[in-house]
């Protein structure tokens, strides 16, 4: 592989340049600079600014920008599936067509307009390793991929395209065609706690001892409580509007599986999953106890109780 050619093409497609790594040209010095940057952050030091490296350096650069401002948006009470509106019990939902909405670019998803209603059997949970949902949407569009929903730091749910379309979010055409996905905003690395505090979100919980694919992860930032409440509201509406069942892959002990599950990827499962359930190379959303959260959703439904979160009330 011609690494100089790769980096120049990557820069053109994703929107970075050599100065991000302290260099001027697409040459061997840039390759060495990228390798050094990658090694310092525990990434594979190949000297190529691919999607993973780009996402990391993008987020680091965003953290140094103090011009963050909350979006001025128009809230809705619905999500959209095959052109039909389905009510969601959550006060902060923004559709791609509304003021302040975030939209997946054309050509970044399977467009099923005019076709029979898509059969959705999986809901895939991701974390975005970004500082906020707007930044995540920018990266997705730059990379030519997509996701149906984003959940921001304050619990705002953004829908970026109709669920009738197949978003490119799970790395597998088989999974993408049968699923809906969400990117939950979380920069993952504890060093970003200062950014969250500086911008009024407060500290995130730190997750210790989480395991995935048989390995224990280093401590990382977890989701805000309001994000979990938004996620549960979204799950409830997904279940009621699609064929997705209240189920998740389980371990031999009856707990949420922490491993890749082949049956899920190859169509033998219907329910709510984390990205790592369908990819051995992914760790999101480690620590997310889907089984327990689904039990809470079912219990709340049986009692007619909807928890919209303290930060969402009276707004």
Residue ranges and their predicted role:
Residues 1-60:
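Short acidic, glycine/serine/threonine-rich helix-capping segments at coil-helix boundaries
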Residues 2-12, 65, 161, 286, ...:
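Catalytic-site microenvironment of enzymes
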Residues 15-18, 37-45, 61-65, 127-129, ...:
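Sec/Tat-exported extracytoplasmic proteins
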Residues 55-117, 122-124:
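N-terminal module-boundary/linker segments of secreted carbohydrate-active enzymes
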Residues 60, 69-81, 188, 192-315:
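Basic/polar, cationic surfaces and motifs that engage anionic cell-wall
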